[in-house]
Amino acid sequence: MNQMQEIIIDKVVVNIGVGQAGDRLTKAAKVLEMLTGHKPTQTLAKKSVRDFNIRKRLPIGVKVTLRKDDAVNFLNKALYVKDYKIPDYSFDKHGNAYFGISDYTDFKGMKYDPDIGIFGMDVAIVLKRRGGYRIEKRKIGKKTIPSSIRIKKDEAVEFLEKNFKVSVVR
């Protein structure tokens, strides 16, 4: 295989959506920092929802973006929690995978703290090929990514099965 066609992990995004600002948001940030070792950023509401008492640009969640070795290490921990099984519908047509973890105490070494409570999280795995993505980002001569470079769903499944020993439940 061409070295530039090799699939790699671009990033792993871990998100906890709280739905409200305040004390629960700071506790969720503390949980993410304990799990990943990185300081989380706040996510803001895109629009106001009167029924849920949410205003536009109100912080309603926290997320951490992990890259390179940090992403691989966290992904191994998260897949261990899921017993290395991901459902087939978790993959999109661009080769990215998404799954949820219902409780942070499922991770190795994490214990329930009554002061924090229970928080679940969403994990997004973004894959890319080693080369070819610059043509979409550059200023001069910007073009769309050709279909030969785009990652298909079955390639992403094969990558995770081979590198992380994940079984995809169909």
Swiss-Prot record:
GO MF annotation: an example: tRNA binding
Covalent S-S links between cysteines: none
Family matches, as InterPro entries: Ribosomal_uL5, Ribosomal_uL5_arc, Ribosomal_uL5_C, Ribosomal_uL5_dom_sf, Ribosomal_uL5_N
Pfam families per UniProt: Ribosomal_L5 (PF00281), Ribosomal_L5_C (PF00673)
GO cellular component, one term: ribonucleoprotein complex
Recorded superkingdom: Archaea
One GO biological process term: translation
Keyword Magnesium (UniProt): no
Cross-referenced SUPFAM superfamilies: RL5-like (SSF55282)
Gene3D superfamilies: 3.30.1440.10
Keywords, alphabetical: Ribonucleoprotein, Ribosomal protein, RNA-binding, rRNA-binding, tRNA-binding
Family: Belongs to the universal ribosomal protein uL5 family.
Function comment: This is one of the proteins that bind and probably mediate the attachment of the 5S RNA into the large ribosomal subunit, where it forms part of the central protuberance. In the 70S ribosome it contacts protein S13 of the 30S subunit (bridge B1b), connecting the 2 subunits; this bridge is implicated in subunit movement. May contact the P site tRNA; the 5S rRNA and some of its associated proteins might help stabilize positioning of ribosome-bound tRNAs.
SUBUNIT field: Part of the 50S ribosomal subunit; contacts the 5S rRNA and probably tRNA. Forms a bridge to the 30S subunit in the 70S ribosome.
Protein name (database record): Large ribosomal subunit protein uL5
Gene, per the UniProt record: rpl5
